[in-house]
Amino acid sequence: MSKVNLVRLLAILGTLLLYFALSPYIHAQVTIAQISDTHIGLARAPHAADNLRKVVQMVNERNPDVVVVTGDIGERPSAWEEAREILKGLKAKVYYIPGNHDVHSDGPAKYRSVFGDDYYKFRIKYVTVYALDSQLLGNWDQFGAHQEPPMSPTIRKEGDEMLDWLAKEAKERDRDDRGQVVVAMQHVPDERDGGFPNDPKPYWVVNGEYQKREEEVLKKLGVHDILAGHWHDGRVFEAGGFRWHMAPATSWSTFGGKLGFALHTITPDGTVKTEFVFLN
């Protein structure tokens, strides 16, 4: 082999080695589509099912790695089934968590009988996602309440068990999640965006003891970004030491925001960039 050909071969081999060394970073970008507050079967949202069908098509066009559905799926078990049938059209794997319209103060048993676990974790590439049931952290059955309604002993016990599980995960994180970007998702956020919502009722956020306990353990887990819904308003803000990525609803608007979904792009350094994709 001539020196010229040898140099060319070495250059090609060097390029290939560099490509394979960098390929985990080149191809590692994670995209998560977030659909929230679909409210199938709600009287005030007569176009909810049609809107969800449109969103499924729009999500598929963007080819995310996974799709998360962050609560308020439907108003009754039959509506859950309708929502799931529509969401079967998604090409990516779908992960669900409940909202306050799915799980009420009587507990998550019905939800679990249809969707399985209401809190868990999953991994996609280098990202670990903690999917949480915010309905175990408060009582959102009374929209008009000016003080936080009491939680039942059963829900308190369930909430304590979820937070204990997170605490155990935090202790084991160095062993199991080394090098992982860790994010969380839940329906009701813990914090307000300054004065928004400008309604002082406790309905809009996790309050009191459970807010403090959850935020403490999520920080120990290394969570900086939390995906949430509930407000029907797409926005990103910082509060409580976290960046909150709030998805718009697909069904109806509470505060005049546009309907649509969120698309989150996560890079290996932990940066989460959110794009809102709106229905026409």
What positions do the PLM features span?
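Bacterial N-terminal signal peptides that target proteins for export
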Residues: 1-13
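Binuclear metal-dependent phosphoesterase catalytic core
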Residues: 29, 122, 233-280
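Divalent metal-coordination and catalytic microenvironments
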Residues: 37, 67, 72, 99, ...
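Active-site-proximal beta-strand elements of phosphoester/diester hydrolases
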Residues: 29-42, 126-140, 183-185, 243-249, ...
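Active-site environment of divalent metal-dependent phosphoester hydrolases
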Residues: 41-43, 74-79, 101-107, 137-143, ...
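Bacterial N-terminal signal peptides
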Residues: 10-23
